[in-house]
A protein has these predicted regions:
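Sequence context of c-type cytochrome heme-c attachment sites
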Residues: 1, 12, 17-44, 55-56, ...
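Sequence/structural segment immediately N-terminal to covalent heme-attachment motifs in c-type
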Residues: 1-13, 18-25, 118-122, 132-162, ...
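C-type cytochrome heme c attachment motif
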Residues: 3-12, 35-36, 51-58, 73, ...
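Short, solvent-exposed loop/turn and secondary-structure capping segments
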Residues: 12, 18-23, 65-68, 98-105, ...
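Active-site substrate-binding loop specific to GH73 endo-beta-N-acetylglucosaminidase modules
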Residues: 20-26, 160-209
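Axial heme c-ligation environment in periplasmic c-type cytochrome domains
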Residues: 31-47, 58-82, 103-107, 183-194, ...
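Post-cleavage N-terminal segment of exported redox proteins
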Residues: 32, 56, 60-64, 82-138, ...
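Short, aromatic-rich amphipathic segments at membrane interfaces
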Residues: 384-409
Length: 453
């Protein structure tokens, strides 16, 4: 269950300690630090009961207060009782306690540092109910749906957000920006989504992180594959692939062919590029913004001068590649800035980061060279684009409005929290009156059944 829910990818300690916390999650509102979830009584969840654990995982309410939805509890609300129990037992009794907390703490700007605002947000966007174990267990009729929408929480990254940063269910899995990267459309649409992928290709991608002629995982997807998907068995991987192949298609009106097929025609071999006299510091020369020279110096040794990559595709082709042929340049820029690191049972893949070797102008220049020669030539990148992508991409509308309205917007946000929280209380009273639901102060223990009160 910990693998399926991808707990390790976010809760990994900065020193690589499993579940020790400290990993920084870049959210639209700022940096959120994942906590220690080992059985340490002082720093982790060692003092939590199973009911408290279930409440935190499903409702985002821990013994210490409200969690932020960087912890995907709106998706985990669907976890079955049996899987909650299995996850609790594993984390409580099978993990070595880490006796220290993260070195930094979450510190979001006002008013988002007021966690009580989550009462209103949760009333709108965290209303899921546990699924039945009989349907979601291996071989169950809803196994694929469960792995995609609940344990895998794919929508947390791949579904666009609305103005209040809740998932826009009308565009489920249609693609969204996450921390500078772009989590692509994974609906069944053959042009904008994964409809052109076979089930077997999807399984290979989940297992290895790479499908030649399609895509190579980087960023958060590489983490999800390394720590989670690559450890699932074939039955579960096929269940995920089958479900995604049946997700209603959503077409992006601006795309006319799949991202991996944008530049299928190979141009003539490039002319030799005169690099002049090169020194170890030459890449940091901010005056050199010639894309061809930068590509030859920084990229061609691995991806080859013609962009074809190596024969075994250990260093991938820049043609038929979603990073270069996608609807926007975010993943190309982020791969250059952050590099790539991915380790699975099939091997290790890496690309160095050029964040400190190239200026924003140079990253833009080499990105444009790659796009024009090997990828989606309709795109272009400026230095300001690179700077914005490095900073996490375009700010959500809510933050942009707050920047303009300042105090009024802050007051509105606080008012929203109060109104939505009041609405939640009214709905809770109605549920209690109907005598079929528990109060927020009580969550059934494993095996306990709710009865009318």
């Amino acid at each position: 269950m910990a693998r399926m829910a991808d707990c390790a990818a976010c809760h990994m300690g900065n020193d690589g300690t499993p579940f020790g916390g400290g990993h920084v999650i870049e959210s639209p509102l700022g940096s959120i630090v994942a906590p220690n979830i080992t059985p340490s009584r002082q720093f982790g969840i060692g003092n939590w009961t199973e009911a408290q654990f279930a409440r935190a995982v499903r409702r985002g309410l821990s013994p210490d207060g409200h969690l932020y939805p960087a912890m995907p509890y709106p998706a985990y609300a669907g976890l079955s009782d049996e899987d909650i129990h299995a996850l609790y037992v594993y984390l409580k009794w099978s993990i070595v306690p880490v006796e220290h907390g993260p070195s930094v703490e979450t510190a979001l700007p006002f008013p988002f540092n007021l966690r009580t605002l989550m009462v209103g947000w949760n009333a709108l966007y965290a209303r899921g109910k546990p699924m039945k174990h009989a349907d979601t267990a291996s071989g169950g009729s809803k196994r694929g749906e469960y792995l995609v929408t609940v344990t895998g929480h794919c929508g947390s990254c791949h579904t666009p957000r609305n103005i209040l940063l809740g998932e826009d269910q009308s565009r489920q899995l249609a693609g969204a920006s996450v921390g500078g990267w772009f989590a692509p459309n994974i609906t069944s649409d053959p042009i904008s989504g994964i409809g052109g992928w076979s089930e077997d290709e999807l399984v290979i991608y989940f297992r290895t992180g790479a499908v030649v002629g399609k895509s190579h995982a980087a960023g958060g997807m590489a983490d999800a594959i390394e720590h989670g998907l690559s450890h699932l068995d074939d039955d579960d991987l096929h269940a995920i692939a089958r479900h995604l192949k049946n997700v209603p298609p959503i077409r992006d009106a601006n795309t006319t062919q799949p991202a991996y097929g944008v530049a299928s025609a190979r141009p003539a071999p490039p002319e030799p590029v005169d690099l002049g006299v090169r020194t170890p510091d030459s890449l940091t020369d901010a005056t050199d913004t010639d894309g061809a020279r930068l590509y030859t110096a920084a990229c061609a040794a691995c991806h080859q001068a013609n962009g074809e990559g190596t024969a075994d595709q250990f260093y991938p082709s820049l043609y038929a590649n979603t990073a270069t042929g996608g609807p926007n340049p975010q993943n190309l820029v982020m791969a250059i800035v952050k590099g790539v690191r991915r380790s699975t049972h099939s091997g290790f893949a890496s690309m160095p980061s050029f964040e400190h070797e190239l200026t924003d102008d140079q990253i833009a220049a080499v990105s444009n060279y790659v796009l024009n020669r090997f990828g989606n030539a309709s795109l272009s990148v400026s230095a300001s684009d690179v700077s914005a992508i490095k900073a996490g991409g375009e700010k959500p509308l809510l933050l942009r409005l707050m920047g303009r309205l300042d105090i009024a917007a802050m007051a509105g946000a606080l008012g929203f929290g109060g109104l939505a929280g009041g609405a939640a209380i009214l709905r809770r009273k109605e549920r209690i009156k109907a005598q079929f639901a528990p109060s927020p102060e009580h969550l059934p223990e494993q095996g306990e059944h709710l009865t009318p009160r």
